[in-house]
């Protein structure tokens, strides 16, 4: 067995220029792994606590030196000599060291950094790619398949400096389409969307995750431009390409109602359901994330009952990758799809348990980035290894997003090489896919052996850990 020889954390910057944590772990066999922790902008009220220094003289009060120090002086000494293969034991030890329900003492960002590093170290010691190790270790799915990518094209709300309310406007290739071709669809739609905006003279830029942020009169205008973009492509709308949205509805609630630019009066929960029904019917929006504020539970139940047969009703702020909240959502039938963000719960073990529970209920899984990302591609391996049905890594733009897509592409290539043939890896699919697209027998032979992985190489470990101090209008249907 390998043993942890040292762990060292430091403060780095995420894609927004806001501090986050990087964690390096080295073992007695010479293997070294490095990982980093993302951070969100629109944060669910029930997420595990991300520890910030709140020192106005350092990084505008958003520093993470306290969390870094917690790793270097509290967590690391407890893990020296332990086998990284004992993930649950190590995660539970860190949870015990913290001793709070929301991980507020050590910080969920500190605990997750170490938890991810431990998983990477175990895979390296086993001489296996991370995704293969995860699949073999946890057996959440019997075989390895590529997920379907959800591509963010445009942003509004807290992710965009414009007058659009919806946080993410997404393009989703149908799951009968090969991964490589689906990546081509995402890239085509992203760049062609910009060309259509330019042709209309729309003023636009990109937001904090890299999606376009045009100034338009309404959310419906944006959908119309997306439809026009699809028409310029070789693909068929509602057969090859569908739309999705992240509403982030908690950011839209005012005095018990929801305000959208599509009409002057705010929407009641019942009226908003009709709005979503029209989005599905007019624009083939089959994926709706956080359609209501997380405590508007009756509205969640209603939309799941009314639209759940044809639409992914996705819980992000509702579930916050939390086991008990997911269990309650299953019992109360408030949604049918789990969005996974490991930093919402704080450990690999807890993340795996939530995925396992959602799977047992017949839900589908979406592995998601955060707005404040790093170049770490950990979640790409986690998505494939846990059999996620979808990934949501943002637009095919900006290095921290592209790193995840490139890792998926690398995994896809490795899987092809192991099978010795050109494959069409498909995810367990969408209810409106072509006949046969969701039949597991239609999939190519699963990968049963790990792709070749590099042998662990000896390297000079980091220094002995030392504690750090603390717009134009378009003609649109009446979607109101």
Predicted regions and their residues:
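Structural signal for hydrophobic packing residues in well-ordered secondary-structure cores
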Residues: 27-29, 71-72, 76-83, 94, ...
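Mobile "lid/hinge" segments at catalytic clefts and subdomain interfaces of large enzymes
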Residues: 46, 139-140, 144-210
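Conserved phosphate/anionic-ligand binding catalytic regions in large, soluble enzymes, centered on
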Residues: 13, 20-23, 102-125, 148-164, ...
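Metal- or metallocofactor-binding catalytic centers and their adjacent structured scaffolds
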Residues: 38-128, 137, 182-183, 211
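Catalytic core of soluble alpha/beta enzymes
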Residues: 220-438
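Short beta-strand elements
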Residues: 21-29, 35-39, 151-173, 228-230, ...
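Long, low-complexity, intrinsically disordered segments
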Residues: 449-480
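Short, Gly/Pro- and small/polar-rich lid/capping loops
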Residues: 1-21
């Amino acid at each position: 067995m390998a043993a942890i020889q040292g762990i060292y954390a430091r403060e780095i910057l995420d894609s927004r220029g806001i501090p986050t944590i990087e964690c390096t772990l080295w073992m007695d066999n010479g293997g070294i792994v490095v990982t980093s922790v993302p951070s969100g902008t629109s944060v669910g009220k029930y997420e595990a606590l991300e520890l910030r220094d709140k020192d106005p003289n350092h990084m505008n009060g958003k520093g993470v030196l306290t969390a870094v120090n917690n790793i270097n002086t509290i967590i690391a000494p407890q893990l020296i000599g332990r086998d990284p293969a004992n993930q649950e034991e190590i995660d539970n030890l860190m949870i015990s060291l913290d001793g709070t329900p929301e991980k507020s003492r050590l910080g969920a960002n500190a605990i997750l950094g170490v938890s991810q590093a431990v998983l990477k170290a175990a895979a390296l010691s086993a001489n296996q790619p991370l995704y293969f190790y995860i699949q073999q270790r946890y057996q959440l799915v019997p075989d390895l398949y590529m997920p379907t990518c959800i591509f963010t094209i445009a942003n509004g709300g807290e992710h965009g400096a414009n007058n659009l309310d919806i946080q993410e406007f997404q393009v989703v290739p149908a799951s009968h389409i090969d991964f490589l071709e689906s990546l081509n669809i995402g890239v085509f739609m992203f760049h062609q969307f910009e060309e259509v905006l330019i042709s209309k003279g729309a003023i636009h830029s990109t937001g904090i995750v890299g999606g376009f942020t045009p100034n338009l009169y309404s959310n419906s205008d944006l959908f119309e431009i997306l439809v026009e973009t699809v028409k310029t492509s070789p693909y068929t709308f509602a057969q090859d390409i569908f739309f999705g949205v992240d509403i982030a509805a908690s950011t839209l609630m005012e005095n018990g109602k929801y305000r959208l630019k599509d009409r002057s009066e705010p929407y009641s929960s019942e009226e908003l359901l009709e709005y979503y029904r029209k989005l599905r019917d007019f624009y083939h929006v089959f994926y709706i994330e956080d359609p209501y504020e997380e405590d508007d539970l009756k509205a969640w139940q209603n939309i799941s009952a009314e639209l759940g047969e044809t639409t992914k009703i996705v819980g992000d702020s509702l579930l916050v990758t939390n086991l008990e909240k997911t269990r309650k959502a299953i019992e109360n039938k408030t949604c049918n799809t789990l969005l996974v963000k490991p930093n919402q719960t704080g450990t690999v073990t807890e993340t795996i348990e939530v995925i396992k529970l959602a799977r047992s209920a017949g839900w589908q899984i979406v592995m998601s980035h955060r707005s404040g990302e790093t170049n770490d591609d950990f979640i790409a391996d986690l998505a494939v290894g846990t059999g996620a049905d979808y990934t949501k890594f943002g637009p095919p733009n900006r290095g921290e997003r592209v790193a995840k897509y490139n890792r998926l592409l690398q995994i896809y290539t490795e899987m092809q090489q192991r099978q010795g043939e050109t494959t069409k890896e498909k995810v367990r699919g969408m209810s409106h896919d072509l006949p046969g697209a969701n039949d597991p027998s239609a999939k190519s032979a699963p990968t049963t052996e790990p792709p070749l992985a590099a042998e662990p190489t000896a390297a000079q470990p980091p220094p002995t850990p030392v504690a750090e101090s603390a717009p134009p209008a378009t003609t649109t249907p009446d979607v109101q």
